[in-house]
Regions:
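Membrane-embedded beta-strands that build the outer-membrane beta-barrel scaffold
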Residues: 1-11, 26-32, 79-85, 91-99, ...
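Generic "edge-of-domain/loop-turn" microfeature
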Residues: 12-16, 37, 50, 102, ...
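Short loop/turn motifs that connect adjacent beta-strands in outer-membrane beta-barrel proteins
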Residues: 12-26, 90, 141-148, 161-167
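Surface-exposed extracellular loop regions of Gram-negative outer-membrane beta-barrel proteins
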Residues: 23-71, 99-123, 163
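Outer-membrane beta-barrel signature, preferentially recognizing the C-terminal barrel domain
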Residues: 45-46, 52-93, 120-143
Length: 193
């Protein structure tokens, strides 16, 4: 089960804000919640047998998917603090700081080739993201039946691998330019020949 909770303070409704007529709206929000990622398919945990004709054009049964009974949802916990509002009847803004921690990350873990598989999706590893989001919007023209609006978004995200599988501190995914290193961001790398 996943859940979330939040608190909103409508600062503009406070008595001390009455003298600031140029501030149309001002809110402060804090939220915390959990969510999951179920990108494992409907039968991702089951051992499956399938038919093939790859051997001398004769039909045969093969192990199509290795059983993975411990496979479960990836879990995320997220905390955010947001300040948003509207100024001068035209300019709106939102500033948000967030921290998201992912555990039981779904990753293709290397598997012995003697099994007939090169990897198996497992719940291993952890990742932490933190950063800020800034959104600005401005109503350039506003009529009864039309409006022209401009907006801009800015995001800064800092990600860090917190845990890998089998006690590893580094893992380079074969045939890609992606590496996971504990304590570092998920990164692209170029090998030196």
């Amino acid at each position: 089960a996943f859940w979330a909770a939040g608190v909103l303070w409508k600062i503009k409704n406070e008595a001390f804000m009455n003298e600031y007529k140029w501030i149309d709206d001002l809110n402060f929000k804090v939220s915390y919640g959990t969510q999951g990622n179920s990108s494992i398919g409907d039968y991702g945990s089951l051992g499956l047998i399938g038919a093939t004709t790859n051997y001398d054009t004769n039909a045969s049964l093969v192990y199509a998917q290795h059983p993975n009974p411990e496979l479960t949802w990836e879990k995320q916990k997220m905390f955010s603090v947001t300040l948003d509002g509207k100024l001068f009847h035209r300019l709106d803004f939102e500033l948000m700081y967030y921290i998201r921690k992912t555990t039981n990350m779904l990753m293709g873990v290397p598997y012995p080739y003697t099994t007939g598989y090169s990897s198996l999706v497992r719940n291993v590893g952890g990742l932490q993201n933190s950063g800020i989001d800034v959104k600005l919007g401005y109503d350039i023209l506003r009529g009864r039946d039309y409006y022209l609006r401009a907006g801009i978004n800015f995001n800064y995200n800092n990600d860090k691998v917190t845990e890998l599988f089998q006690g590893r501190q580094r893992w380079e995914i074969a045939n890609t330019l992606v590496a996971y290193v504990v304590g570092k961001p998920v990164m692209y790398y170029l090998p030196i020949w």
